[in-house]
A protein has these predicted regions:
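Short, conserved micro-motifs composed of acidic
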Residues: 3-185
C-alpha cells in the first residue's frame, strides 16, 4: 500500500525486497545457529557488542538493564525518546576456563546519568571511543563521540572528541581503524 502511495520510494522497495529475501533465507538456512546468550542477555535493550583484550576474552556492550545490586532507590534517568532507562556500558569477562561471567557495569567515570553506547578500542586497548547522548532540556539533544583512556585497571572520565565545531551535529557509533589513523562514525 505504501508503494502505491509513494511510487519509487526506496524505503518501500527495500522493505518488500527484505520480506521476499527473508522467505528465501528461511528455506536455505546456513550452518550457523544464532541463539540467545543466557549468561548475559536480559529482557532489556542491548546492542553494540565489542570484543576486547589480547585474547578477546572480554565483551563490552550497551544495555538499558538495571545494574546488578542496584536497588529500586537507584537514581535512574529515562530516555525522553524511548521511555526506557538510559543505556550504560557493561563488561563481561571470560574466566580461565573460557566460561563467560555475569555482566558488570562500567565505572561511573564512563557511565553517567545519560546514554552511553557502542564502544570501540584502540589497538593497544588503552583508548575507548564511545557514543554519548546528553539530554539537556535547555539545549540540543544530540549524540557525540567521547574518548576515555585506561589507567591501571580503570577507564577514566570521558571527554568529547573535537570532530565538528557546532554542537548540533549528531555523531555516534565510532569505530577506530586498527592503525588508529581513522575514526569511522
Amino acid at each position: 500500500d505504501y508503494l502505491l502511495a509513494e511510487p519509487g520510494s526506496i524505503l518501500a522497495f527495500n522493505g518488500i525486497t527484505g520480506c521476499e529475501e527473508a522467505t528465501k533465507w528461511k528455506q536455505n538456512p546456513t550452518r550457523y545457529v544464532v541463539k540467545r546468550m543466557e549468561k548475559f542477555n536480559s529482557r532489556r535493550s542491548e546492542f553494540g557488542p565489542m570484543l576486547y583484550g589480547e585474547k578477546y576474552d572480554q565483551l563490552y556492550f550497551a544495555s538499558t538493564r538495571t545494574p546488578k545490586g542496584a536497588g529500586k532507590d537507584k537514581d535512574e534517568t529515562t530516555n525522553a525518546i524511548t521511555g526506557q532507562r538510559n543505556n550504560d556500558l557493561f563488561l563481561v569477562k571470560q574466566d580461565e576456563n573460557g566460561a563467560w561471567q555475569a555482566p558488570i557495569e562500567l565505572e561511573d567515570e564512563v557511565n553517567t546519568e545519560f546514554d552511553e553506547g557502542t564502544p570501540s578500542f584502540s589497538k593497544d586497548g588503552n583508548t575507548m571511543y564511545y557514543t554519548y547522548c546528553a539530554q539537556d532540556p535547555e539545549g540540543p539533544r544530540t549524540s557525540e563521540i567521547y574518548i576515555s583512556t585506561r589507567s591501571s585497571a580503570k577507564w577514566g572520565k570521558g571527554t568529547r572528541a573535537s570532530i565538528v565545531k557546532d554542537s548540533v551535529t549528531a555523531l555516534g557509533h565510532p569505530a577506530i581503524s586498527p592503525d588508529g589513523k581513522y575514526l569511522y562514525f
